[in-house]
Amino acid sequence: MDNESILITGPEILDAGGIRRGSVLIEDNRIADVSNTLSPGDADTVIDGTGKLLIPGLVNTHTHLSMTLFRGIADDLPLDRWLNDHIWPAEARLNGDYCYAGALLGCIEMIRSGTTSFNDMYFYMDHVARAVEEAGLRCVISHGMIDLGDTEKMTAELRESRRIIKECHGMADDRIRVALGPHSPYTCSEELLKETAALADKNDLMIHIHVSETENEVSEVSRSHGMTPVEYLDEVGVLGPRTVAAHCVWLKDWEIDVLAERDVKVSHNPSSNMKLASGVSPVARLLQRGVNVSLGTDGAASNNNLDMFQEMKTASLLQKVNLEDPTALPAMDVFSMATLNGARALGIDAGLIAPGKLADIVILNTRRPHLTPWRNPPSHTVYSASGADVDTVICDGRILLRDGELEVLEEKYVMELAEAAAAELTG
């Protein structure tokens, strides 16, 4: 790394450890010091953090980045009709150039709303990786594998996953890593799931999979295999500490115990689950059992944005109303889900503002009417702030956004490129 050193002077600092004030020194791609004794002469670049809040970069643990191109094409539908009648037919027309355009757009949206790392499952992932490399973000990518019991399709899906591993794992100074992405237990054959588990074990790779998103999925898997999705995935060896299980809405208590015992990382996607009326994930119970629960936006077609601030607020309020308990999932807990828990889920040495941690940092402008009076940073961050309050973003020690201005990518060009791609894909 040859990044210049950066000093952020005088912000309030909020992370999973609490709130404090201090200056933050970044050298290369890591936080070198956090203290009140640092001076401007200690760094090449100085950012004035007065009147601002510094937090760890947000981590989106489940999304489909290039689906920004499908934003708004199939709203107000249940998941099965949404997929079968609209999304899958549109996805059949995708190519690498379209996915690159959608990924660039998604990267800009995430930078502007404070996300520095994400977990992405989709198609043409080498093109997605190229977009992420140009944007300067950090991610785990996986080719979404679906075989529907077709042996030839299974072989092709595994071949593509191996290609992406070979070409993309460790790209961009290791900011881009590759996982295996079997779509779900109802779209993947037992053989594909077992091959995935074996390949993950052999290469020490993460697995990214949708689990128990809807009642229909649970019923379908139970009819086909005589087991719930969690039980079935455990049987075929998919569940483990490197597995990120997205959604996990329809869970029995004993299934939560299995997830906890296997140290599975759960990605909660409240906005998508609400929009598709999939149900409410038992997040409070998962956390009580010691499961690492993080947050994801899902794709922009089922959210319909990638704003993790929205996701934090929605997650907290959804648990409160569902449990009829105003104390459920308080602000600091959900903030930790969006930062430290997400970093742990993806195996990223970040999520805290502390010496030695990766320099993935977001600075918020707190001098806004909706953040005034500024008296409770955790509350304001979760319940009042939005992605529009993001002032500066640093990922891997590199400034991507400063004073609201992008320092990577050409925003106007990317929006025009994505608009044209979406028009060609969806008419």
Swiss-Prot record:
**Cofactor: binding comment:** Binds 1 zinc ion per subunit.
Q: What else is known?
A: SAH is a product of SAM methyltransferases and is known to be a feedback inhibitor of these enzymes. As a result of this inhibition, organisms have evolved efficient enzymes to metabolize SAH via different pathways. The pathway found in methanogens differs from the canonical pathway, it uses the deamination of S-adenosyl-L-homocysteine to form S-inosyl-L-homocysteine for the regeneration of SAM from S-adenosyl-L-homocysteine. 5'-deoxyadenosine is a radical SAM enzyme reaction product which strongly inhibits radical SAM enzymes.
* Cofactors named for this entry: Zn(2+)
Its top-level enzyme class, in one word, is hydrolase
| Quaternary structure, from the entry | Homotetramer.
According to its UniProt entry, the function of this protein is described as: Catalyzes the deamination of three SAM-derived enzymatic products, namely 5'-deoxyadenosine, S-adenosyl-L-homocysteine, and 5'-methylthioadenosine, to produce the inosine analogs. Can also deaminate adenosine. The preferred substrate for this enzyme is 5'-deoxyadenosine, but all these substrates are efficiently deaminated. Likely functions in a S-adenosyl-L-methionine (SAM) recycling pathway from S-adenosyl-L-homocysteine (SAH) produced from SAM-dependent methylation reactions.
Q: What positions does the entry give for Zn(2+) binding?
A: 62, 64, 210, 298
| Identification of the protein by name | 5'-deoxyadenosine deaminase
Q: Where does substrate bind?
A: 91, 183, 213, 298
